Each structure stands twice: as C-alpha cells, then as structure tokens.
Curated annotation (Swiss-Prot):
Homotetramer. HAMAP family: IolG. Belongs to the Gfo/Idh/MocA family. It comes from the Bacteria. Keywords: NAD, Oxidoreductase. Involved in the oxidation of myo-inositol (MI) to 2-keto-myo-inositol (2KMI or 2-inosose). PANTHER family: INOSITOL 2-DEHYDROGENASE, PTHR43593. This is Inositol 2-dehydrogenase. It catalyses: myo-inositol + NAD(+) = scyllo-inosose + NADH + H(+). One of its GO terms (biological process) is inositol catabolic process. It is an enzyme of class 1 (oxidoreductase).
Length: 337
C-alpha cells in the first residue's frame, strides 16, 4: 500500500523531505507540490524526477482528490492556515515546527482537530525519534535509576548568523529541548527562569549568549538547560538525568576514537543535520506507517501547543529575570486516546 503525499513548501527542509519520501523511505509517493515560488517547486520536481503536479495554491493541493496526506514545510506564519485546511479536508498532516507562530494559533488547531474527532496532526519534533534519546527514555521507563530528580542539559552550536536574536535562543534552539524533555519525563513544566552568565566575546553585540534556562516540572523535577550558540568547537547536545539510584546520560554520536601524536581524540560534529539525520528518516517513516495504519502516534498538536505556551513563558522570563509560571490548561481527553 502506498500513501500519496502532497508537499506545501519546497525550501531546504521541504526539498529534503521530498527527497526522503521519494528516494529513501518505504510506502510513500509524492504526487503534488506547491511553493510560493512556483519555479522553485517545479525545479524540485524536475531535479528529483518526480511524477508530481505543481500547484499554484496550497489550498488546491490540500483539496486534490489524489492527495491522501499533506506535509507542511512552508514559511512558519503559513503553517496554521494549511494545517487547518488539512483538518477541514479530513487529511492527515505532518507540519514542521512551529505548528503555528503563536500559542493561540496552536490552540486553534487543537480545537479544530478535537472537533473533527480523530488525530490528524503530527508536529515535526524529531528528537523523540533519535536512537540515543529513545535509549535514554527506555532506561527511565524501566525504573533502573529510580525517579528522575534533576536533569542537566546543553544545546551548543558553533556559531549563528547576525540575524539571530536573544529570543531565538528559545524559539529556534531551546524549543527542541522543551519538547523532548516533556516526552522524556512524561511530565509538564510549571515554571521557568532564565539567567544570563558572563557574555561570550564571540557573540554579536545585540545577542545575550550563553543563557541558562531553569525549569520545574509538575512532579518536582528540576531541569537546567545551557544554551550556547557561539561555542565555536562544534554542535553538541547533552542530557544527563540524575535519578534516585543512578545517573543516565544521552549517548554521544558514534565516532572513531583516535590515538595519534600523543593525543586521544574523537570527532565532534559541527552540523545539526548530521547529528539528527537518521531521526528525520525514522520520524517521517513513522508518520507514513501510522497514516497507513489509520492512527497517528507521533508528536501531537497538543505537544505543539504545549511547546508554544512554554516558549512564551521562557521569553517572558528572559525579559523579566523572574520565575515565570508555565500555565497549561488540562490536556483534553481526546489526546489521551
């Protein structure tokens, strides 16, 4: 059985997902493509030698009879309207983050999906599909180290461009930890504080870097996340869980260990795409399999909404320097199915 997919947005991530679905994964076929720049969409179809129709309008693509599922990889502010259109059409939709650019936009999607009565939305949070995070989750679920008491995490990038701003440390960078740590702990955040250490001389004048984000969860677990986007040395993701009877740490990516010139060394990756490339494959294959099986199991619209509410609280904490509550309404029973 093959799933016919339409893709809205053929920028870098859209093009990569089209390549992935048409050349790497099993059970899918790209039958429709749309982009605000029609020539760009046509070029992707030509370059990848696809038998796919190029649509001038994303809404027409969603309504197309041969499109069974939709990937939304367009400009962030357009995500909400296309996800809502897919829900209205009763079609499963995979939406790259952000689900919407505001928490209210995410809530609109949650309400529309609940009204439809069936899960149709998966959000593009890929870290729960990473082999290392899955292994860490398995350790926590097994109870081998008891209940998690504290987490020490870091998200480090070698450099960022001059357009990167202080709030983007939350909305572009920390957003991944916001999602994956909720999933890892099966817990929600109740408060957040952001503190700023001594500023790195490598950061642009307008950017506060590094930052430390301090969370408390509903179960009382404390989390500290270091965000350092000008660390220079590489792309480095760390996560250490301190439990009642032991410590579990996210494994490092596989790398050859070298002994040479009186030094023992291993390589550190420099690009986030290399660090999580396999997770992207597993994530989209999971979406395809779930749609064909008739039940989505990946990150939900509720997860996207929770991430947006938490990110808003983090940005408020950046500005105030105070402990800011993270206020989520009760999760609808619809998402407990």
């Amino acid at each position: 059985m093959t799933l016919n997919i339409g893709v809205i947005g053929t920028g870098a991530i859209g093009r990569d997902h089209i390549r992935r679905c048409s050349k790497v994964l099993q059970g899918s076929r790209i039958v429709a493509v749309n982009d605000i720049n029609r020539d760009n969409a046509a070029k992707v179809v030509s370059d990848l030698k696809l038998d796919a129709k190029v649509y001038d309008n994303g809404h027409d693509l969603v309504k197309a009879a041969d499109v069974q599922a939709v990937l939304v990889t367009s400009w962030g502010p357009s995500h909400e309207e296309f996800v809502l259109a897919a829900i209205a059409a009763g079609k499963p939709v995979f939406c790259e983050k952000p689900l919407a650019v505001t928490a209210q936009g995410c809530k609109n999607i949650v309400e529309a999906e609940a009204k439809h009565g069936k899960r149709l939305v998966q959000v593009g949070f890929m870290r729960p599909y990473d082999q290392g995070y899955r292994a860490l989750k398995q350790v926590l679920t097994s109870g081998q180290i008891g209940e998690p008491l504290m987490l020490h995490c870091a998200h480090r990038n070698p450099t960022v461009g001059e357009a990167y701003t202080t709030d983007m440390a939350i909305t572009d960078t920390l957003i991944h930890e916001i999602d994956v740590l909720r999933w890892l702990l099966d817990d929600d955040y109740v408060s957040v504080q952001v503190v700023f250490p001594r500023k790195s001389a490598k950061a642009f004048p307008h950017l506060k870097d590094p930052q430390i984000v301090l969370f408390e969860t509903a179960k009382g677990t404390r989390i500290d996340v270091e965000i350092f986007v000008n660390c220079q040395y590489g792309y480095d993701i760390q996560c250490e869980v301190v439990g009642e009877t032991g410590i579990a740490k996210l494994p490092e990516p596989s790398s050859v260990q070298m002994r040479s010139g009186a030094k023992l060394s291993t390589e550190i990756l420099t690009d986030w795409k290399d660090r999580f490339i396999d997770a992207y494959d597993v994530e989209l294959q999971g979406f395809i399999n779930d749609v064909l099986a008739g039940k989505l199991t990946g990150p939900s619209a509720w997860d996207g909404y929770a991430a947006a509410v938490t990110a808003d609280a983090c940005v408020a904490a950046q500005l105030s320097g105070e402990i800011v509550p993270v206020t989520l309404p009760p999760r609808p029973a619809f998402y407990n199915k």
